[in-house]
Amino acid sequence: MRRLVSSAFAATVAVFARRAVVGALVVLTALCVAVEAQAETPLRRPLSFLPAASVLVVTPGAANVVERVMQVSPYLAPQADTLTAHSARAFRRLAARQPDLARCSADTLARLFLVTGEAHIAAALDRERLRRDSLLSANPTDRSAAQALLNTLGWVAASEGTDLYVNLPVDCMINVATPALRCTVDQIREMGRVKYRLSGFPQHGSALRLHLRLPAGVEPDQVFLNGRRLLAPQIERGYLVVDRAWRNNEELYYDLPERKQLFGE
């Protein structure tokens, strides 16, 4: 009798153990699928880069990209990366395959960013910007190198509706003039601090979802809005998102870690 009870008990335990293992596997699989889906899900509507002409570079002296390019030729003009409806579908499919970004051309990276809004793709564009900057420094009269560097101003910011993305660490004034947004964002680096000062809104303010790509070593809870630390900061696709009704001269800032390069990876 005891053997029968023991056998029945052991069988029951085994059944529950199997169910627990299966349940855990189901949950783990669901989590993996959810993470993968999130990483591969394109934006509902693709972004558009703001025109390079809307980015006024204010970096002083020889570090000013526009001044360096104009010394090569005053006739150079930035070339924009855009998407058609057909190419947007193609790049959505490419994004779903999660290509090796290190092997992608700059044009491909730019369009992948427009369909995904992913911060790690913007980081790859920033590395390309630095590479082009180095090429022009090594060949300061090279027209092709100057054109390539000038084109990177078209990657500084992007928008869709009331979403505005600030992607590259360029000291500049970004003049936003789209059907849904009209404002100015001053991106300033001074004394180890990065500031974003917003203005140009109507008197009553305006709704704006501001997406900021933070540098390595800066945590979202280290960002301050109008002098107060952000509470429960929101992260989407690697960007810090500040979604609110903005008024003129409001300001975000964070301090850079010591001995860290801006947006270092």
PLM features per residue range, with description:
Residues 230-235:
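Short beta-strand segments within Ig-like beta-sandwich modules, predominantly Fibronectin type-III
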Residues 224-228:
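Short strand-turn-strand beta-turns centered on an Asx-Gly dipeptide
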Residues 19-32:
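Bacterial N-terminal signal peptides
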Residues 238-242:
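Short strand-edge motifs at loop-to-beta-strand transitions and within beta-strands
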Residues 40-214:
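Aromatic (Trp/Tyr) and acidic
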Residues 256-265:
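Glycine/proline-rich low-complexity spacer/linker segments in large multi-domain proteins
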Residues 1-17:
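N-terminal secretory signal peptides that target proteins for export/translocation
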Residues 31-42:
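Bacterial Sec-dependent signal peptides at the C-terminal "C-region" and cleavage site
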